[in-house]
């Protein structure tokens, strides 16, 4: 289960730019969260309607909270023909799963439900290793049967795209805007974002990422600030989403290799890459993997990913790891 950290756009744009494009701002609700979009548009044309229509289409494909969606029907045991959006999300999820050795898995839904993370019904959770072992038999993308674009799930297998769907939504909105000739934009959905070109002042979009703590003064809220151009960014963290039962802290990130909530020293992971769907999924996978394994993966993907990690050492003190490419992007 991915949990985003709030992001803040530091550069406030003027109402118009030197090339007579006008700044348009769209916002709304989607997927249980909010979206905020800014873009430079000739004559100030707004694409709010098209954006909302696209988000509705995405919900109809991959939202587990819409009973009529493709993913919900699959989870109910129907054999159903998928659409382009579903296929895009699924194969991006599989790609990240393969690159991380299975630490990202879109079939973790039974585990998420067991641990009470869907409806925050954590008081009913009884930690039972035997029960978890049984559930684990229903986890794994290999338990999906594909024939052309028709899919059926093995008995008990359930899909959950929550850790990648918002990133995919960002990518699809970006595609929509570019098809309309918009080449300067900042798109944010639930904390995942993508930036292209410049803002109305002709400057690169500048982003602040919050410190992974609820006890930080607003003036000191940012862990780091970076310039973002023609890239996507996603941040995952567990400091806001967890519960304590019998003295044990259970974070909302599930480790699909063990069936248990991730137990490691990571506080937050920020990933920058070309596609927001991949940034979204990798950030979640790295939160499950822990620092050592994440650093090993990054070495193999250093031409694809930029990473900023906040973690604690054995004394509980905050430490950071920044990949070489990410260091060049940070401005504070």
Predicted regions and their residues:
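Mature catalytic core of soluble alpha/beta enzymes
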Residues: 4, 15-332
């Amino acid at each position: 289960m991915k949990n985003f950290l709030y992001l803040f756009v530091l550069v406030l744009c003027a109402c118009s730019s030197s090339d007579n494009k006008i700044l348009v701002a769209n916002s709304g609700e989607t997927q249980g969260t909010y979206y905020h979009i800014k873009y430079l548009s000739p004559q100030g044309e707004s694409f709010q309607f098209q954006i909302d229509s696209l988000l509705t289409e995405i919900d109809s494909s991959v939202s587990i909270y819409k009973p009529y969606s493709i993913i919900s029907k699959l989870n109910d045991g129907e054999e159903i023909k998928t659409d382009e959006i579903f296929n895009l999300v699924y194969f991006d999820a599989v790609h990240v799963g393969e690159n991380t050795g299975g630490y990202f898995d879109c079939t973790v839904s039974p585990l998420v439900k067991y641990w009470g993370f869907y409806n925050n019904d954590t008081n009913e959770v009884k930690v039972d290793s035997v029960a978890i072992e049984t559930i684990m038999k229903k986890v794994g993308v290999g338990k999906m049967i594909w024939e052309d674009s028709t899919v059926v799930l093995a008995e008990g297998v359930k899909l959950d795209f929550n850790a990648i769907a918002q990133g995919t939504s960002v990518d699809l909105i970006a595609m929509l805007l570019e098809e309309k000739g918009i080449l300067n934009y900042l798109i944010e959905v639930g904390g995942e974002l993508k930036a292209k070109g410049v803002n109305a002042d002709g400057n690169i979009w500048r982003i602040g990422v919050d410190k992974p703590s609820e006890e930080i003064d607003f003036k000191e809220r940012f862990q780091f600030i970076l310039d973002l151009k023609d890239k996507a960014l996603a941040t995952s963290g567990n400091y806001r989403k967890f519960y304590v039962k019998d003295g044990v802290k259970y974070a909302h990130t599930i480790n699909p290799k063990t069936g248990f909530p991730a137990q490691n020293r990571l506080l937050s992971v920020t990933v920058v890459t070309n596609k927001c769907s991949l940034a979204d999924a990798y950030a979640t996978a790295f939160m499950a993997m822990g620092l050592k394994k994440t650093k090993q993966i990054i070495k193999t993907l250093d031409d694809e990913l930029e990473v900023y990690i906040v973690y604690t050492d054995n004394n509980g003190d905050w430490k950071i790891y920044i990949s070489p490419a990410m260091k060049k992007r940070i401005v504070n």
